[in-house]
From Swiss-Prot:
Keywords for this protein: ATP-binding, Helicase, Host-virus interaction, Hydrolase, Inhibition of host innate immune response by virus, Nucleotide-binding, Nucleotidyltransferase, RNA-directed RNA polymerase, Suppressor of RNA silencing, Transferase, Viral immunoevasion, Viral RNA replication
Miscellaneous notes: This protein is translated as a fusion protein by episodic readthrough of a termination codon. When readthrough of the terminator codon TGA occurs between the codons for Gln-1116 and Gln-1118, this results in the addition of the RdRp region to the replicase.
Binding locations of a ribonucleoside 5'-triphosphate: G833, V834, P835, G836, C837, G838, K839, T840
Residue ranges annotated for the (+)RNA virus helicase ATP-binding domain, each copy included: 801-963
GO molecular-function terms, A-Z: ATP binding; ATP hydrolysis activity; mRNA methyltransferase activity; RNA binding; RNA helicase activity; RNA-directed RNA polymerase activity
Organism: Tomato brown rugose fruit virus (isolate TOBRFV/Tomato/Jordan/Tom1-Jo/2015) (ToBRFV)
Domain RdRp catalytic residue range list: 1380-1493
Protein name: Replicase large subunit
PROSITE patterns: ALPHAVIRUS_MT, PSRV_HELICASE, RDRP_SSRNA_POS
InterPro entries documented for this protein: (+)RNA_virus_helicase_core_dom, Alphavirus-like_MT_dom, DNA/RNA_pol_sf, P-loop_NTPase, RNA-dep_RNA_pol_alsuvir, RNA-dir_pol_PSvirus, Virgaviridae_RdRp
């Protein structure tokens, strides 16, 4: 073992010394491979030939500047400015490298010959002749092409293939290659180009005005433009001459004229505008239109050349969130933009941003200017006194090194000679550790004397200024000023005899008699400051006159804002709207509100057209007489003989009026349709409707749905007749698929020209010999169809098998009263159940066949229900009480019974909502149960072009019940159902995995022989179904046909390879297909589709996960033990133990990660960094954007680390963020509500549920507004409030719709981990003035007092000014032995979710309590459309409704609303106890009560984002309500208490003591440790990670009860 270690050590030492040959060979090989790879990579770079003669140093410059190219230097051509000319080729190639090859490119002022030589046929050059130099250059390029071609010809060569396309294009259409127009006026357009367009500008951008550049790029549809130009930082100094040493060129500036030339050459100079170049350097945005701008971004600087790119930006993506594309979208937003411009001062004109306002950007793009400052140098002529001034760039470190050193000189040593000596010494050398080294500052030696003078003057004047500030007195016979002059003369001696003259002329000093004033000038300015100054003085900012049309544009802007909420607002013709308002003299805001109400279906009518075009609106506004012209009629007959064969068409009946869109008086008819025979021999043209439905539907939503249903029947009949007429007109041109649906009989030959699949059609369309078309009811004999002599052909179809539509139209027409359908008052309950939840089983268990009715959509379902109901042998279900929907409507009134107690509609959501409303009305029932599945296949509109608005598809119900346990579906399908349904879906099936899939190579592979299919065969489409039936499969149906059915095994087949829209991840057809089986499902498909992906995901699920969805029903027994004592809490004093670390540990376990958040400077970070906010309409005063500085107060520092934040400083940004997150973030969830009627019903339930029966009517003998009520209100107010009312005379009402806005400085702590990912917004306070509160405060205080006295206090607690002890007394009589459901309704954004409906409910409550009508109306208008003003932050906005957080009714109003909301949704007659406080509620119900879908009702009716929780212990107002066998105890939330101990707003020790006392008051019950175990259970129910916390509860008691010990939780922040 020792030998092995020795050998290993020796080998390692040899390797380290380099003696190991194997390792050495491997290293050499590695080095060789690396070198080869590197050379190969370099060889793949683009190759550029550099033919001009340049020096070796210039060769190195070019190579280092452009490492992207492999440059070959030939040095075979002498030329002027050789380096610059050669670099121009490299610059061109570098720019073209940025552009995708083959994309249309515009070379602005470019060299078209270079592109031809490179074979770039996709480049167009704009080469305007702006001076004679340009003409000469263009001719030179043509000569180079001729020279190249002549060389090829001389050598008998042809143009290479890569150049041929470009040269052919130049020879055939030279204008496509080059034009002599400026880029702004170029007319070239390459029509065949479909990709993005690019542009380059190589040293040509100087000649394009910067203000026109963006528009010119947009006109050419340029996506990105790459540019290169010469520039030098020194141009921003006061120097008139700047050298570009690397390319031996120079800039000369004379005013705005900037000349570029090459040194020591006689070539012509280039002249440009200095201000124009400065714009390209400094500006970031170049506007192209009112929507798009080009944003400049610098890329790189190489050899005095700056490269940048201009990218096209769509600003609508920034402001709107999505890009709106439409026919008239540009017009709409243009109008919005115009209104904005007039409304806001210089809205976008002054928004021009200078990129270089950021110092870091200046240092990056001007690297030579980093740490450099501009220092002035002065000079003056002794003869003429003419002053001169120039500036130089000097290292900032050099300047302060000199100043700091010479400021230490004594007065006698501070001479110009000493300063010059020091400056010269540190410039020439520096001594480091006794060794002389070269100076780090490379300052021009010719400037040292002038710089020394500047340093000396600055230091001398600074010293004198300090002395003058101290000594303002005379010294002997000389004044102070005289002493100063003596000192200066003594310092300079005879070298500068006119120092005084110089100082006076430079205005460095001022002399007035004997008084001397010295002003020390700024020694330097930074390059960044000079750059901004030069730009602002050189560029005139645009000015816009905003005074004209202010009032008109304000109104139009508000109207357009109102219209912008429409879904298709970008397609609304704004110009027509504006002209309409002007012509008709209509207020635009009124017109806009009407349009929004109509288009949003909030006006009591529905417009069915898809687009709000002028034609559609005009049709909707036609009067009834004009609308009836050309309408559809049904001709009836006079019965001349018993047979229908000789019927003739006489008289008219208006079918269009069936929908109720025209009054009864407009009908033209001989008689009512009393039988189907009156359809016989009706002309086909009378039944074919060009207008599918009414344009306008009026009335309640149920009435509109019923009218739409009648119109759908008319449209279906019209479509069927129209198709039959088409078949008769062109029988020979029918394709194979159409032949399967139709039949055509030739009457003369009695032969079917097209044989129908079915027989015995009920009706058809006949063609007479006169080529007239009529509808005929068909009769049959032993020879077939009975015909007339005048008939030529008869056409039938699958739609004419029964009289369905005709019979239903006849029945529904009888039900109309004055053209309006009757709406039943019966209660409608929607039972929403998942597939297989037992809806049919539930119907059979509930139904009483003697008095109830069951309706189903299809015959199979009806027979199945009859079979199951009569399975016991007793016939209960008959044709009278179990019927199909069509049968019930068609044969209405013919049965033995016409009235039923309850109606059960199975799969009711597959029906037209209007049909459901008719069924409820026709059955005369008291309550109707509509069973369905909101996620499965809904009603499908089969008539193309018939309008079925989205809000018509939503059934109107009074109550919703959910069923979320499936008895059919296996566990894997249950997992899929949980993704589609809200709530937890469970199953009872023992089958876990049931689905599989098989990819079939082609449709022909599926046949009964080679591919027998197991179980029920289903398809998605009718075509696939017919294909399978034709191949020999039996019992095949579509998914839509078997909705509601159950099968053990299912084979699902797809033969169609083309995309099918109903096969999608969220398609209801897929849901139905997956949920029909109980054992297995196999999917056979010819293509990959979303269903394959779903099945593959389900196949991968683990059995452990699937076990979670299993429900086992069992019997549970509860052991009950009665206690000896009841009525009082057992008290056990809590021991005072524990430490600070206990509280920290508990907090970290409950809210992990919160204590690690360093959020002390979050507010500062938000103010200093860029922020993007989505703001609704508001007015901002940016003069308030910088808050007034305040003396910082250092608060006490908590020892317990929590998520508490520092107090925020009120300001524009902070207040705006709070307003956006609070007031501007209100949800919009509610459906269509009849506000007044619904509010009245809700208030009825409120009074019935909460108020004592004898006190439900107001006491009219008590005055609400009297001296006593005012005095009671004043007793509760502070002296400051009363003082504000000193000048109020109570004569007139202030503006009740005006509110003030403010924020709370301290953010509210949340007991979750959201602080780790979001910036918590402050709570907003919106409040009235004290004058308004003085009027309505006493009034609502009295109303509140009367209401609370009327509440049934034995069952309900309205938590207003109640103590924890009173809460314990209220819940103290709960019987813990009685099983209870404890419910909590959690509502987010409670205040901001309240809308017009909530206001209507609250006002109705106050009205019934006795609120006077006038004051009630004033208060109502003051809460409708309100104006908010934040004077501190400079914000003004308008809000509709919403609860005002600082209102006199804020607390009691919120309490009343939450109570009314729960009363409308829950059975309050069963409640045991209920408590309400603001948005908090706690309800105790008996175990097992059925509750509706609270979330659904809260969303649609109350606009609340609500969740209903079932708890073991209640949580109310930050307290845990622990009920036990002796009563009830209320514990303050210990986690909330610990969170407060991390407060960072405690000012001083006195404030801390007040804080401790307030905590002691609320946490007093923690002193009783008898129920700590129940408290642990309650906390763990809310916070899953909370450990048992008795140790921390005792620690809290210990610190809260000891004043001195409590101080140890904080330390002094000022130390």
């Amino acid at each position: 073992m020792a030998y092995t270690q020795t050998a290993t050590t020796s080998a390692l030492l040899d390797t380290v010394r380099g003696n190991n040959t194997l390792v050495n060979d491997l290293a050499k090989r590695r080095l060789y491979d690396t070198a080869v790879d590197e050379f190969n990579a370099r060889d793949r770079r683009p190759k550029v030939n550099f033919s001009k003669v340049i020096s070796e140093e210039q060769t190195l410059i070019a190579t280092r500047a452009y490492p992207e190219f492999q440059i070959t230097f030939y040095n075979t051509q002498n030329a002027v400015h050789s380096l610059a000319g050669g670099l121009r080729s490299l610059e061109l190639e570098y720019l073209m490298m940025q552009i995708p090859y083959g994309s249309l490119t515009y070379d602005i002022g470019g060299n078209f010959a270079s592109h031809l030589f490179k074979g770039r046929a996709y480049v167009h050059c704009c080469m305007p002749n702006l001076d004679v130099r340009d003409i000469m250059r263009h001719e030179g390029q043509k000569d180079s092409i001729e020279l190249y071609l002549s060389r090829l010809e001389r050598g008998n060569k042809v143009v290479p293939n890569f150049q041929k396309e470009a040269f052919d294009r130049y020879a055939e259409t030279p204008d496509e290659v080059v034009c002599h127009s400026t880029f702004q006026t170029c007319t070239h357009q390459q029509v065949e180009n479909t990709g993005r367009v690019y542009a380059i500008a190589l040293h040509s951008i100087y000649d394009i005005p910067a203000d026109e550049f963006g528009a010119a790029l947009l006109r050419k549809n340029v996506h990105v433009c790459y540019a290169a130009f010469h520039f030098s930082e020194n141009l921003l100094l006061e120097d008139s001459h700047v050298n570009l040493d690397e390319i031996n060129a120079c800039f000369s500036r004379d005013g705005d004229k900037l000349t570029f030339s090459f040194a020591s050459e006689s070539t012509l100079n280039y002249c440009h505008s200095y201000s124009n170049i400065l714009k390209y350097v400094c500006k970031t945005y170049f506007p192209a239109s009112n929507r798009e701008v080009y944003m400049k971004e610098f890329l790189v600087t190489r050899v005095n050349t700056w490269f940048c790119k201009f990218s096209r930006i769509d600003t609508f993506l920034l402001y709107k969130g999505v890009a709106h594309k439409g026919v008239n979208s540009e017009q709409f937003y243009s109008a919005m933009e115009d209104a904005w411009h007039y409304k806001k001062t210089l809205a976008m004109c002054n928004s021009e941003r200078i990129l270089l306002e950021d110092s870091s950007s200046v240092n990056y793009w001007f690297p030579k200017m980093r740490d450099m400052v501009i220092v002035p140098l002065f000079d003056i002529s002794l003869d003429t006194s003419k002053r001169t001034r120039k500036e130089v760039l000097v290292s900032k470190d050099f300047v302060f090194t000199v100043l700091n050193h010479i400021r230490t000189y004594q007065a006698k040593a501070l001479t110009y000679s000493n300063v010059l000596s020091f400056v010269e010494s540190i410039r020439s050398r520096v001594i480091i550790n006794g060794v002389t080294a070269r100076s780090e500052w490379d300052v021009d030696k010719s400037l040292l004397q002038s710089l020394s003078m500047t340093f000396f003057l600055h230091t001398k004047l600074a010293v004198l200024k300090d002395e003058l500030l101290i000594s303002k007195f005379s010294l002997g016979p000389k004044s102070v000023s005289q002493h100063v002059w003596d000192e200066i003369s003594l310092a300079f001696g005879n070298a500068f005899p006119s120092i005084k003259e110089r100082l006076l002329n430079r205005k460095l000093i001022k002399v007035s008699g004997d008084a001397l004033e010295i002003r020390v000038p700024d020694l330097y300015v930074t390059f960044h400051d000079r750059l901004v100054t030069e730009y602002k003085t050189s560029v005139d900012m645009p000015v816009l006159d905003i005074r004209k049309r202010m009032e008109e544009t304000e109104v139009m802007y508000n109207a357009l804002s109102e219209l912008s909420v429409l879904k298709e607002s970008d397609k609304f013709d704004v110009d027509v709207f504006s002209r309409m308002c002007q012509t008709l003299e209509v207020d635009p805001m009124t017109a806009a509100k009407v349009i929004v109400a109509v288009m949003s279906n909030e006006s009591g009518l529905t417009l069915t057209f898809e687009q709000p075009t002028e034609a559609n609106v005009a049709l909707a506004l036609k009067d009834s007489e004009k609308a009836s012209e050309g309408a559809l009629v049904v001709t009836s007959r006079d019965v001349e003989e018993p047979s229908m064969k000789g019927s003739m068409a006489r008289g008219e009946l208006q079918l269009a009026g069936l929908s109720g869109d025209q009054p009864e008086s407009s009908y033209t008819r001989n008689e009512e349709i009393e039988s189907l025979e009156q359809f016989h021999m009706a002309t086909a043209s009378s039944l074919i409707r060009k207008q599918m439905s009414s344009i306008v539907y009026t009335g309640p939503i149920k009435v509109q749905q019923m009218k739409n249903f009648i119109d759908s029947l008319v449209a279906s009949l019209s479509a069927a007749v129209s198709n039959l007429v088409k078949i008769l007109k062109d029988t020979a041109a029918i394709d194979l698929e159409t032949r399967q649906k139709f039949g055509v009989l030739d009457v003369a030959t009695k032969r079917w020209l097209i044989k129908p699949l079915a027989k015995n059609h009920a009706w058809g369309v006949i063609e007479t010999h006169a080529r007239k078309y009529h509808v005929a009811l068909l009769e049959y004999d032993e020879h077939g169809v009975v015909t007339c002599d005048s008939w030529r052909r008869v056409a039938v179809s699958s739609e004419s098998m029964v009289y369905s539509d005709m019979a239903k139209l006849r029945t529904l027409r009888r039900l109309l009263r004055d053209g309006e359908p009757h709406v039943s008052s019966a209660k409608v309950v929607l039972v929403d159940g998942v597939p297989g939840c037992g809806k049919t089983k539930e119907i059979l268990s509930k139904v009483n066949f003697e008095e109830d009715l069951i309706l189903v959509p299809g015959k199979q379902a009806a027979e199945m229900i009859k079979r199951r109901a009569n399975a016991s042998g007793i016939i209960q279900a008959t044709r009278d009480n179990v019927r199909t929907v069509d049968s019930f409507i068609m044969n209405y009134g013919k049965g033995t019974r016409c009235q039923f107690k309850r109606l059960f509609i199975d799969e009711g959501l597959m029906l037209h909502t209007g049909c459901v409303n008719f069924l409820v009305s026709m059955s005369l029932c008291e309550i109707a149960y509509v069973y369905g599945d909101t996620q499965q296949i809904p009603y499908i509109n089969r008539v193309s072009g018939f309008p079925y608005p989205a809000h018509f598809a939503k059934i109107e119900v009074d109550e919703v019940e959910t069923r979320r346990t499936t008895l059919r579906c296996p566990a894997d399908i249950t997992h899929y159902l949980n993704r589609r349904y809200e709530g937890y879906v469970m199953c009872t099936s023992s089958v876990k995995k049931s689905v599989s899939q098989e990819m079939v190579s082609g449709a022909a592979m599926i046949n009964p022989v080679s591919k027998p299919l197991n179980g029920k065969v289903l398809t998605f489409t009718q075509s696939d179904k017919e294909a399978l039936l034709s191949r020999g499969y039996t019992d095949v149906h579509t998914v839509h046909e078997v909705q509601g059915e159950t099968y053990a095994d299912v084979s699902l087949v797809r033969l169609t390879p083309t995309p099918v829209s109903i096969i999608a991840g969220d398609s209801p057809h897929v849901l139905v297909a997956l949920s029909r089986h109980t054992q297995t499902l196999k999917y056979y498909t010819v293509v990959m589709d979303p269903l394959v992906s779903i099945i593959r995901d389900l196949e991968k699920l683990s059995s452990y996960l699937l076990d979670m969805y299993k429900v086992d029903a069992g019997t549970q027994x509860q052991l009950q033990v009665d206690s000896v004592f009841k009525g009082s809490n057992l008290f056990v004093a809590a021991p005072k133990t524990g430490d600070i670390s206990d509280m920290q540990f508990y907090y970290d376990k409950c809210l992990p990660g919160n204590s690690t958040m360093l959020n002390n400077y979050d507010a500062v970070t938000m103010r200093l960094t860029d922020i993007s906010l989505n703001v609704k309409d508001c007015i901002l005063d940016f003069s308030k954007s910088v808050a007034a500085p305040k003396d910082p107060i250092k608060p006490l520092i908590p020892m317990v680390r929590t998520a508490a934040e520092m107090p925020r400083q009120t300001g524009l940004l902070e207040n705006l963020v709070a307003m956006i997150k609070r007031n501007f973030n209100s949800p919009e969830l509610s459906g269509i509500i009849d506000i007044e009627n619904t509010a009245s019903l809700v208030v009825d339930k409120f009074f019935d549920s909460y108020l004592l029966k004898e006190k439900r009517k107001p006491n009219k003998n008590v005055s609400l507004f009297c001296r006593e009520s005012l005095n009671r209100w004043l007793e509760k107010q502070e002296q400051v409030t009363i003082g504000q009312l000193a000048d109020f005379d109570f004569v007139d009402l202030p503006a009740v719709d005006q509110y003030r806005h403010m924020i709370k400085a301290q953010p509210k702590q949340k007991l979750d981990t959201s602080i780790q990912s979001e910036y918590p917004a402050l709570q907003t306070i919106v409040y009235h003035s004290k004058k308004i509160n003085a009027i309505f405060g006493p009034l609502f205080s009295e109303l509140t007092r009367q209401m609370l006295e009327s509440i049934d206090s034995s069952k309900f607690l309205f938590f207003t000014r109640k103590t924890p002890a009173q809460i314990e007394d209220f819940f103290g009589d709960l019987d813990s032995h009685v099983p209870m459901d404890i419910l909590e309704l959690d509502i987010s954004k409670y205040d901001k979710s309240q809308n017009e409906f909530h206001c209507a409910v609250e006002y109705e409550i106050w009205r019934r309590l006795g609120l006077e009508d006038f004051l009630g109306e004033v208060w109502k208008q003051g809460h409708r459309k309100t104006t908010l003003k934040d004077y501190t932050a400079g914000i003004k906005t308008c809000l509709w409704y919403q609860r005002k957080s600082g209102d006199v009714t804020t607390f009691i109003g919120n309490t009343v609303i939450i109570a009314a909301c729960l009363a409308s949704m829950l059975p309050m007659e069963k409640i045991i106890k209920g408590a309400f406080c603001g948005d908090d509620s706690l309800l105790y119900f008996p175990k097992g009560c059925e509750f509706p879908d609270i979330q659904h009702t809260a969303n649609l009716m109350w606009n609340f984002e609500a969740k209903l929780f079932r708890k073991q212990y209640g949580y109310f107002c930050g307290r845990y309500v622990i009920h036990h066998d002796r009563g009830c105890i209320v514990y303050y939330d210990p986690l909330k208490l610990i969170s407060k101990l991390g407060a960072k707003h405690i000012k001083d020790w006195d404030h801390l003591e007040e804080f401790r006392r307030s905590l002691c008051d609320v946490a007093n019950s923690l002193n009783n440790c008898a129920y700590y175990t129940q408290l642990d259970d309650a906390v763990s129910e809310v916070h899953k990670t909370a450990p048992p916390g008795s140790f921390v509860y005792k620690s809290l008691v210990k610190y809260l009860s000891d004043k001195v010990l409590f101080r140890s939780l904080f330390i002094d922040g000022s130390c």
